[in-house]
Amino acid sequence: MLLPATGASRSAAIMSDTDSDEDSSGGGPFSLTGFLFGNINGAGQLEGESVLDDECKKHLAGLGALGLGSLITELTANEELAGTDGALVNDEGWIRSREDAVDYSDINEVAEDESRRYQQTMGSLQPLCHSADYDEDDYDADCEDIDCKLMPPPPPPPGPVKKEKDQDGLTGEKVDFSSSSDSESEMGPQEAAQAESKDGKLTLPLAGIMQHDATKLLPSVTELFPEFRPGKVLRFLRLFGPGKNVPSVWRSARRKRKKKHREPIQEEQIQEEECSVELEVNQKSLWNYDYAPPPPPEQCLSDDEITMMAPVESKFSQSTGDTDKVMDTKPRVAEWRYGPARLWYDMLGVPEDGSGFDYGFKMRKTEHEPAIKCKMMTKLRKLEESNGIDLLADENFLMVTQLHWEDDIIWDGEDVKHKGTKPQRASLAGWLPSSMTRNAMAYNVQQGFAATLDDDKPWYSIFPIDNEDLVYGRWEDNIIWDAQAMPRILEPPVLTLDPNDENLILEIPDEKEEATSNSPSKENKKESSLKKSRILLGKTGVIKEEPQQNMSQPEVKDPWNLSNDEYYYPKQQGLRGTFGGNIIQHSIPAVELRQPFFPTHMGPIKLRQFHRPPLKKYSFGALSQPGPHSVQPLLKHIKKKAKMREQERQASGGGEMFFMRTPQDLTGKDGDLILAEYSEENGPLMMQVGMATKIKNYYKRKPGKDPGAPDCKYGETVYCHTSPFLGSLHPGQLLQAFENNLFRAPIYLHKMPETDFLIIRTRQGYYIRELVDIFVVGQQCPLFEVPGPNSKRANTHIRDFLQVFIYRLFWKSKDRPRRIRMEDIKKAFPSHSESSIRKRLKLCADFKRTGMDSNWWVLKSDFRLPTEEEIRAMVSPEQCCAYYSMIAAEQRLKDAGYGEKSFFAPEEENEEDFQMKIDDEVRTAPWNTTRAFIAAMKGKCLLEVTGVADPTGCGEGFSYVKIPNKPTQQKDDKEPQPVKKTVTGTDADLRRLSLKNAKQLLRKFGVPEEEIKKLSRWEVIDVVRTMSTEQARSGEGPMSKFARGSRFSVAEHQERYKEECQRIFDLQNKVLSSTEVLSTDTDSSSAEDSDFEEMGKNIENMLQNKKTSSQLSREREEQERKELQRMLLAAGSASAGNNHRDDDTASVTSLNSSATGRCLKIYRTFRDEEGKEYVRCETVRKPAVIDAYVRIRTTKDEEFIRKFALFDEQHREEMRKERRRIQEQLRRLKRNQEKEKLKGPPEKKPKKMKERPDLKLKCGACGAIGHMRTNKFCPLYYQTNAPPSNPVAMTEEQEEELEKTVIHNDNEELIKVEGTKIVLGKQLIESADEVRRKSLVLKFPKQQLPPKKKRRVGTTVHCDYLNRPHKSIHRRRTDPMVTLSSILESIINDMRDLPNTYPFHTPVNAKVVKDYYKIITRPMDLQTLRENVRKRLYPSREEFREHLELIVKNSATYNGPKHSLTQISQSMLDLCDEKLKEKEDKLARLEKAINPLLDDDDQVAFSFILDNIVTQKMMAVPDSWPFHHPVNKKFVPDYYKVIVSPMDLETIRKNISKHKYQSRESFLDDVNLILANSVKYNGSESQYTKTAQEIVNVCYQTLTEYDEHLTQLEKDICTAKEAALEEAELESLDPMTPGPYTPQPPDLYDNSTSLSVSRDASVYQDESNMSVLDIPSATSEKQLTQEGEDGDGDLADEEEGTVQQPQASVLYEDLLMSEGEDDEEDAGSDEEGDNPFSAIQLSESGSDSDVGSGSIRPKQPRVLQENTRMGMENEESMMSYEGDGGEVSRGLEDSNISYGSYEEPDPKSNTQDTSFSSIGGYEVSEEEEDEEEQRSGPSVLSQVHLSEDEEDSEDFHSIAGDSDMDSDE
């Protein structure tokens, strides 16, 4: 055995094949065996005689024959051979074998294990010399026979064989030290063949050694082992030091180095080396070892640590010693053989190992290299001598010396300005001024560079990427200079793709899209600016720092694969848990779907009683008879049945047995019985009778030592790692569950009270048995999807169920051939049509019409009836249960009022959109919940968890409603969503946040000062936003307004989802497993439940937010305080009847107003025709709508909200009114047009026509080119208004004329001929269409139409003087609030014009005067004053003046009372007082109009209070809506037959508005009439009657509250009435004294006259709706009537009328707009409803019914009939009180009092106030009135409705902020 000098060295030794004989004088043979028994002397013998005797020494020497001494023999022989036998060394340095050599092949037996390791290590190393023949040598031919049997040698790598060599060998400076076994492993079959030379001798390298004489004198031990010290303890580590015989641990680390690149060494080198070897050997001492030089680094094994830390190499490139052994047995495959060029290699027939493939190259003839080199050197030397330059210097081969780069240097830009620079070089060199790029910006744009320098993108060098193979590889060796004279045969390279190579693009890079190619994207800008803030946020721990990801090196899970984790990962939890067996065996009747258990048809009653069967009466049997019935105990029967079953089981051989085989086995009279109470009212899936369920006990082990699952009375224990429920089990927790193919549901065992027992009732009698246990079943986790109504699955089930029924009928048939009747099937399936049944029957049977089987369906002879197993497979019991669940839920929805279309199952692709739109009731249907749950379990979506589908309704269950996986679109109601553009301009707008405040916020958030100083403004803002968002998410943070949405990542969203699921799961477990006896008081129990939920959420918040319990309790107390405060405020304004609304309001307002992305759910209670209530839920997601709703709900009262809800109908009424107004305008316009037509067109001046139009203009009227439709040259210019002369269609001549005008004949571009094609111009086709269209129009002149009735103006002489200046008919009534505001604003303007008032014009600037707002708490200025005026905040002068005084007080406080600014403010106040005094009368009237309670008329105040009572109290009674309006005759036809005098609240309000009630008694009579009518029609026990009684009670109660005030008003009214009567009597005595009703001569109605009636005139108001007085007039009634009939309704002709109108009162003038505003009459009606007290505003009406009569005349009988029918008068209380009326005051605005009476007067209805009566100067004819009535209903009704609509529209406007009224509550 050979000992290498070091373990990794490749030192070579020259072996000798001669060994000297032992020298007898040396003391015997040198034996290593002596080492085993003591020290050895210099001769190699044991020292001393004391240890062993001679006999033992002889035995030891005999052991040497076993080969222990052969090591020394080999070593010494090696050196001697070099000295004595140098001539035997052949050309290549190896030793020739001798014929007399002895074979010592058994020397390896001593250290066999070591040699094996050694051979593997040496085989993995490469020799120093790179010879192609290296692998062809064999080092040990003696062992070849044995080793070849054990391990067949692999095929050799390709390489040329040198024929001129006699023996094989390998040449090198040093011979590689390799063992025999290693060389064999490296040797192929060809090498083995070559190893036997021509003469049949073994010519292997070691053969010579073995055949040499081994009896030579051995050297001394000290020569062999320099560390040996005689007489001392042997130091084996030094003797056999490291590397001497140490096995190599990393034996195969470098096996991947291929040997194919070794180059053959030239002959001359070989010869030189031979000589040097011989010289060295001769000079060496025999025992001087020739150690190898230190090996180069690439040949050394790497350190263990480096190897461990290095990146993992591919499994294929890394091989171990074990794999080597396996691979050696297989034929080797060249790596390149099966690469991309495999096809070509297959075509060329290249073998797998690639041997012999040479590309067709030929080796060159070996020429002595020195000769070549000499020739080259001589040439170069000659050149050097001639030039005097060293051409072979290293500098000459640098790139810098090879290129003429100096020529490309631009010394002066002017020189190259005209030249075009090379684009590639120009882009790398940077900007140079040229004609194309005059400046750097233009250059950057041209190059496509981004202008920003701080772009956060990967940095790239401007220079091309270095190719490492070109720089560092020996690529020049692979250049083929001559294919016929190759220095070596090239091997095909192996294609390797380096993922680190930047030239390779192995995947599509993830680049952010840029908006434009030239401008940097917004994202990049954001990233660059937010980089610093991100670093800071990472430091403060708000966001996690993102790890630097290297895209080219994906992270490896487990580089060393130490743990095999991937084999231990738990399986993803699917739908059906794989915990234990889940084979459910139903009873035989259930599997066969037998009738009573699986009904074929269920009617509505059965469906409503689904799984809740009522006790039915028996028609026969013992229980059908009355009388006492005995109750039988079942104890004996149970034991008897158990014994029978046990005997049956024993008889069948023991083991498990299935007993549920017949319907009788399914009785509850025997066996064990448990009760299960389902917590869900209507579970999504329920089992039918006879279906089986397993009880499973899920147990999660504790970590570490687990005691095991606790024993349970029922069920099998299943150990689960992942939870089969939505929440996970805690370690050590056991949860029992029902599990079957339909659902899995947790169950909770409860002890049955001892007092409870079970009664079983059959036809025969009653039976009693004990109950032991009861389970509460939690919420189901569906495993089976319920089909949707009319879905494909549902229809398929119906079809299959019918088919199965038919098959079973055939099986039951005893006839041959089998036959059944259609009637049997129809009886079972009454809902199926006969055609559908026939369709199923035709598949398997034929209908026989004659013969024995007539009217029977007979089974087809060729049809095979399915077997029982096949029938069972067609329809499973689970499918039936799902179908029953679907139809039961469908019935429930139908009962709730949902139509069939509302709960169709959606298509899969539109499902998520569909989920958002369907109603909540439908969303909870089982087909939706089961589909959602199953999809969520498959990971397709998430569940809403809390919401409408929660079966408990109190947050203790899961809501199975789909929401998307990603945190977009809809989320939980509690999670805020970002809504765009809602913070712009508000104080939450981050752009308005100053830097100082932002930094202050950061300090509050705990950011260090030094970090804040480093940030720029927008980085500070970014940190504020991020930290605010983070705190808002966790529920903290006072500055939540700066939070921006809930931009959760998907991972965060999933985490929150899991947490919420776990919370509800734990809560459900806690509640359902609780053994507390719950109180019957539902309120307290629900409060406790909410406490549980709140505790759970508090704990969760404490964990999430790191808040202490004291902080949480403080926050909760604060919330409760605010809630209490809000409730107290609400209680002040709302009545007791509104309390049910508070919860709604609270739930609405509890939504965080600053949070975005809210979802508002409004639950509305409706009542159907039968009086049954049902609830519907509306979901609102628009933030603007939510805000408006919340604001109205919190600030407005019920009356307002009711009107607000009814706005749609009122809006429609307004539209009708608007339509009438527009029709009136059109009528007037038409008349004006007709007048213009009569005048005729003006004469045209003849002008020269241009031959060709200059411009390419096209007329829109006639289509001609060269002019526009407004041009007078257009032939149709004057025809637009005038009717055409032809009465009907155009003649042909006219059409031709039209064509000439439309198309110019000389326009050659209209038609083009291109080859065989004719191209028609677009203009030609358009003009042809125009001609065709115009020719089809039929035109009739106005003169030929039937004449319309025209209103004739009065022609009487005595009326001529009544002509007055023209005024518009539609005089706009002005809101008194607007008038007041305009007066106040004019006063403000006057004050602004005062000198030196500038400091008071705008608010004080806090930056300029820093301490102002600390001193002044209520600042005020003229600008704020003006804004308040425009907002209608001042209904009276006092409030306005109070705010103005505040300016003076503030100035005195801050500047001092004597300061000049205070004096200026005082002058402003003085001016204001002066102006207010000037307009005192007008302002007083306006204030009264605004606030009726300020009115002098007691009747108005009395009516005002009564109306308040009706609207705010009586109408607010819950469910009082049937009494709000008159009963609809369409819906209740017989009502008016039963009820003679109907009454309702709306009618009462109308009576109030007409001031019909002067006392409470008359008011209460009508209120009591409502109750009396209800009793009469509905009965005293009706719910309606109870509601009516409640209305009456509320009325009496409220009247009692106002008793004192109403009593005083009644007295005042009575006094006024008496005074008026007295005055009337006095006036009747003196007929010449003009009274209010004395007919006045026409000349009294002078323009300057202003007539007014005292307020006491109202006492004449008639109670009998007959308020029209017959007052004689100068104008006869007959004449007026005639005028009315002849009128044409033309309102523009009023100036021609002869009836002069009397002047209105002062108030009327005040409320009318100025003449300048009359022009805005088109918009007038929009504001007509602004004033609920606008009855006093007696301008002309905007509706047709408001058109007045010519003068005062009695009402026509037709109108009176209408009035009687409508229950109201046609006039609308045309009472004028001087200074009366006006708007409701601000304080009463919310009450929304609707005064129908305060409307425009009807001029036809002449009440006591004659001063305003005759206003219109014309009449509406009866015909027109009839026409209008047909179009818009009776005029009276439209007016009344209009008045209410106007009020409500005003209210609505006030909410929206568009009204003139005050909207700031």
Swiss-Prot record:
Keywords: Acetylation, Acyltransferase, ATP-binding, Bromodomain, Cell cycle, DNA-binding, Isopeptide bond, Kinase, Nucleotide-binding, Nucleus, Phosphoprotein, Repeat, Serine/threonine-protein kinase, Transcription, Transcription regulation, Transferase, Ubl conjugation. Residues 512-971 are annotated as: Histone acetyltransferase (HAT). Residues 1190-1268 bind DNA. Residues 161-176, 969-978, 1228-1244 have a biased composition (Basic and acidic residues). It is an enzyme of class 2 (transferase). The TFIID basal transcription factor complex plays a major role in the initiation of RNA polymerase II (Pol II)-dependent transcription. TFIID recognizes and binds promoters with or without a TATA box via its subunit TBP, a TATA-box-binding protein, and promotes assembly of the pre-initiation complex (PIC). The TFIID complex consists of TBP and TBP-associated factors (TAFs), including TAF1, TAF2, TAF3, TAF4, TAF5, TAF6, TAF7, TAF8, TAF9, TAF10, TAF11, TAF12 and TAF13. TAF1 is the largest component and core scaffold of the TFIID complex, involved in nucleating complex assembly. This is Transcription initiation factor TFIID subunit 1. It comes from Mesocricetus auratus (Golden hamster).
